[in-house]
C-alpha cells in the first residue's frame, strides 16, 4: 500500500447513511482535551436511552463505524439507543499524551459519563467498551467512579489480562527495550516511519508477516497480538474494511505498555499506584452495582478468551446469576466489531445485553 492510499483511507467516513454526528469538545477531569461524538438519526426516537461506546488503545471512536452496510452504530440506532462515542486520551484523533489505564479510569470516563447525562437529562446510561477502553472503564467502575452506569458490555478483555505466549514474551522482554528507543509503539509506522528504529522494526515485521500486503495490518499484529494476523481473521473482514484499517491505527505510549506488562505478570489488572482515586486492589469486591456482560472471540489472539471467562467467574461468584458471558466461534479481537458478518453473528448479542 502506498503512503497516499493510506492517507486517503484515514479520512473515510463510512457507515453514516442517514446519520448526523455532533462533535463535542470537553475536558477530562485533569484537563486533558477530549471529544464526544453524538450520533443521531433525524426524527428517530431513542426510547432505550443513552449508550456510550468506548474504543481501545491507538484507535479512535470511528472504529465503531467501518465501511460496512450494517455497523454496530446502525444496530444500536435501529434498536432505539441514543449513541455517544467518546474519544478518550488514547484516541488518535487527539493530541498524543503519555497515559496509563489509571489516568483514563480516574479522569476520562467519569467526565464522559457526566457529559452524556448532562446533555440527555437521563439518570443513567449503559456502555459498550472494547479492549483498553474496557480495562480502563472496568478500573473506573470497580473504583466506584461510575455509579450512574447500569450495564457494561465488555469486549475482549476486562479484569483478567491473559495473553498468548508470544505476546506475553514480547511485553515482558521487548517492551523495556522498545522504551529505550521510542516513547511510543505505533502500527502507523507500517506506512509512515519516524526514524531509524521505526524503519528497522517495520522492515522486520513486514518480512515476518507475509499473510497480506497491508503493512499496517502487519504492524497491528506485532504491536498488539500473536498471529497472522493477530487482531482479526482475514476471512472475517472485507476488502474495504481491510483497506480502511490502514488509517485507523496509530501510536500507544510506552507508559501504557509498562502498566500492561505488570498486569500480564499478575494475570489481572494492577493499578500504577500513582492515581489516588483508583482502588488499590482491583480484585477486591467492586464498588459498582452495574451488570456486566463479558464477550470474547473464541479465536482472539490479542487477549485470550480465558481472561473473559475468569472475569465472568469472578463477578458471578460475587453476584451469582446476574452477569453474562458469551464467546463467538470463529471470531478474534476486533472482527467482533467490524467483521463483515458481525451484523448477524455478534451485534445482536451486544444489543441484547445492552437492552437488559
Model regions: which residues?
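N-terminal cap/lid segment of alpha/beta-hydrolase-fold proteins
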Residues: 8-43
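Short, surface-exposed "cap/lid" segments of acyl-processing enzymes
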Residues: 28, 35-92
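Alpha/beta-hydrolase-fold enzymes
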Residues: 118, 122, 132-272
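Short beta-strand/loop motif that positions the catalytic acidic residue
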Residues: 288, 294-296, 300
Amino acid at each position: 500500500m502506498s503512503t497516499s492510499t493510506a492517507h486517503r483511507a484515514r479520512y473515510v467516513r463510512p457507515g453514516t447513511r442517514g446519520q448526523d454526528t455532533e462533535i463535542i469538545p470537553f475536558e477530562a477531569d485533569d484537563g486533558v482535551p477530549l471529544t464526544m461524538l453524538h450520533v443521531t438519526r433525524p426524527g428517530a426516537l431513542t426510547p432505550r436511552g443513552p449508550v456510550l461506546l468506548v474504543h481501545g488503545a491507538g484507535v479512535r471512536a470511528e472504529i465503531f463505524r467501518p465501511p460496512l452496510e450494517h455497523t454496530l452504530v446502525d444496530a444500536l440506532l435501529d434498536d432505539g439507543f441514543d449513541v455517544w462515542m467518546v474519544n478518550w486520551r488514547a484516541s488518535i484523533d487527539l493530541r498524543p499524551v503519555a497515559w496509563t489505564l489509571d489516568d483514563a479510569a480516574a479522569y476520562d470516563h467519569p467526565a464522559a459519563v457526566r457529559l452524556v447525562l448532562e446533555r440527555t437529562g437521563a439518570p443513567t446510561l449503559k456502555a459498550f467498551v472494547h479492549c483498553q477502553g474496557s480495562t480502563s472503564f472496568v478500573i473506573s467502575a470497580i473504583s466506584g467512579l461510575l455509579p450512574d452506569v447500569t450495564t457494561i458490555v465488555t469486549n475482549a478483555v476486562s479484569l483478567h489480562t491473559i495473553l498468548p505466549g508470544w505476546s506475553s514474551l514480547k511485553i515482558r522482554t521487548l517492551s523495556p527495550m522498545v522504551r529505550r528507543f521510542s516513547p511510543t509503539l505505533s502500527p502507523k509506522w507500517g506506512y509512515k516511519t519516524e526514524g531509524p528504529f521505526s524503519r528497522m522494526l517495520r522492515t522486520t515485521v513486514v518480512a515476518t508477516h507475509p499473510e497480506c500486503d497491508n503493512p499496517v495490518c502487519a504492524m497491528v499484529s506485532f504491536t498488539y497480538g500473536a498471529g497472522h494476523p493477530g487482531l482479526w481473521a482475514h476471512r472475517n473482514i472485507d476488502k474495504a474494511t481491510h483497506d480502511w484499517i490502514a488509517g485507523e491505527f496509530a501510536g500507544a505510549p510506552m507508559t501504557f505498555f509498562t502498566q500492561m506488562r505488570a498486569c500480564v505478570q499478575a494475570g489481572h489488572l494492577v493499578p500504577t499506584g500513582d492515581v489516588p482515586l483508583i482502588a488499590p486492589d482491583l480484585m477486591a469486591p467492586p464498588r459498582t452495582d452495574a451488570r456486566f456482560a463479558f464477550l470474547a472471540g473464541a479465536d482472539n489472539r490479542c487477549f485470550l478468551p480465558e481472561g473473559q471467562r475468569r472475569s465472568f467467574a469472578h463477578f458471578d461468584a460475587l453476584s451469582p446469576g446476574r452477569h453474562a458471558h458469551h464467546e463467538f466461534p470463529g471470531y478474534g479481537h476486533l472482527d467482533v466489531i467490524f467483521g463483515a458478518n458481525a451484523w448477524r453473528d455478534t451485534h445482536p448479542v451486544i444489543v441484547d445485553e445492552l437492552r437488559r
